[in-house]
Amino acid sequence: NGRPALDLAILDSTDPAQVRSAARRAPMAKTLYIVASKSGSTSETQAHLAYFWNRTVRGLGKTKAGNHFVAITDSGSIVEKQARERRFRDVILADPNVGGRYSALIAFGMLPAALLGLDLKLWLERAAGLMKVSLPSVPAARNPGLVLGAILGEAALAGRDKLTLLTDEELTAFGAWQEQLVAESSGKNGKGIVPVDVETQLPPRNSPRDRLFVYMRLTGSLDAQVKKLQAAGHPALVLPVGDVYDLSAEIYRWEVATAIACAVLGVNAFNQPDVQDNKKRTQQKIAA
C-alpha cells in the first residue's frame, strides 16, 4: 500500500510484429519479465520466454539476465525448472488445485496487482467479504454467486445462451477476463454460454431474443440503455461496483456463478478438453 505504480504490459500474442513492438517499448535494463504459466508447457509462453531470455542474455549477459525474470507456475513444471537453472530473481509457486482461468485471486493475478500499486490487503478483504456470503450455509436467495449462476444457467436452458456484458468505460477490461472464464468453463459437450464482450449495441427492439444482459455499473453511464433493454422485454441484470477494489469481489462472484451455471447446464466447469486438444495439436504442428 502506498507504493508507486509501475508500468505493466501484458503480452498475449505470438504475432512477430507485436512481440517486437513490445520488446522495443521495454528497455531490458529497466524491465522485469514475468513468466506466468501453470503447466509451464504452454507453447506460446515458452516461445515468449525463449525470445526475451535470449534477447536479454545478448544484451546484458547471462549472469545478469536472470535478475530480470520472475516465474509464476505450479510446482514441478518446466518453467520452474528453467527458472531455477537460470537463477531467476524469484520463483512463485501457485496453488496447483486452482485452474488457470480461476486463478485471478492467487499469485497469477496478485503479482501484477501489486506491481500496479494496489493495496493487496484491501483487495483481498473485498474478495473475502463476497466469499463469506457465498458459502453453502448462506440461504440461496442471499447468496450472490449462486443467484447469478442460477440465472445464467436457467437463462441458457431457456434459449438465452448469449451473455452480453455491459460495462462503464472504466471497467471495459473486465469483460476480456469474464469472457474466457465463462466460455472456457461452459463450452463443451455441445452445450455452453456464449459471452459477448465489447459489442456494438443494437436498438433494444432489434436485439436478439437469445440474449441475457449483465451491466457492471460503476458510473451509471449506461443506465438509460439498460432501462430501454428492460422496457423492451430483455432480461438485464445490474451489478453495482463501488470502486476498483470491488472488482476482486466481482471476480469471486463470477467464478462461483460460472461454476453454478455449469452445474445447471450439466457440464464440468473445471475441465478443458478442447483446450488440451488444441495444445496437443499445436505442439504436434511445431514438432512436424
Give the ranges of each region predicted by the language model:
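Short glycine-rich anion-binding loops that position phosphate/pyrophosphate groups of nucleotides
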Residues: 38-42, 75, 218-219
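Active-site phosphate/pyrophosphate-binding segments
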Residues: 55-214, 253-288
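Short beta->alpha connector loops at strand-helix junctions that form conserved
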Residues: 11, 37-38, 92-97, 239-242
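Structured mid-domain segments that build the active-site/substrate or prosthetic-cofactor binding neighborhood
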Residues: 190-202, 211-248
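Extended, hydrophobic alpha-helical segments in both membrane/secreted and soluble proteins
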Residues: 19, 35, 42-56, 69-71, ...
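Short, structured coil segments at secondary-structure junctions
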Residues: 4, 86-87, 232
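Glycine-rich oxoanion-binding loops at beta->alpha junctions
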Residues: 2-32, 41, 48, 197-201
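A short, gly/pro- and small-residue-rich
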Residues: 48-60, 225-236
